[in-house]
């Protein structure tokens, strides 16, 4: 909730200069990936068998929330704008089902996490997420063209 007024102010201040919806998605994925890489650092610096400051977790949450603010509200908005009027409710359902599917995939991936694999787990998940964000950045012009001017 802390970030909502900040982003509302930022988008208002930027006006027409703000990034497109697809770029916001790519930046959101990048932030999510960076939050995983951030969580890798304490294990690399101090080892996985010691307690570290909660600062690491708070900072990771802060980074991933920035990503969430760039994906979730934008995704909801774009879904309603792109959906045909008679199918808006169904498309919103598909948006939420895609989130559920992602959580189901994550439930399988998280099984690879142990204290022995902690650093590698966060590094691999963060790295893959960042690769997907880079791929999305490359596709932004094509996506914007397909969106036919919908911001």
Residue ranges with predicted function:
Residues 1-15, 28-36:
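Transmembrane alpha-helices of Major Facilitator/SLC transporters
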Residues 27-49:
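C-terminal ends and interior cores of transmembrane alpha-helices
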Residues 40, 100-113, 127, 138:
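A gly/Pro-rich, aromatic-decorated transmembrane alpha-helix motif that marks the paired
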């Amino acid at each position: 909730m802390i970030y909502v007024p900040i982003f509302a102010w930022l988008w208002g201040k930027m006006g027409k200069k703000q990034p497109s919806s697809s770029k916001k998605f790519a930046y959101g994925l990048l932030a999510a990936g960076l939050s995983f890489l951030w969580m890798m650092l304490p294990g690399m610096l101090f080892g996985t068998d010691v307690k570290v400051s909660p600062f690491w977790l708070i900072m990771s949450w802060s980074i991933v929330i920035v990503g969430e603010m760039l994906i979730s509200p934008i995704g909801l908005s774009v879904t309603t704008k792109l959906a045909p009027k008679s199918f808006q409710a169904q498309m919103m359902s598909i948006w939420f089902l895609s989130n559920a599917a992602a959580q189901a995939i994550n439930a399988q991936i998280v099984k690879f996490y142990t204290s022995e694999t902690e650093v590698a787990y966060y590094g691999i998940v963060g790295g893959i997420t960042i690769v997907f964000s880079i791929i999305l950045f490359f596709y932004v012009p094509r996506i914007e063209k397909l969106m036919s001017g919908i911001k």
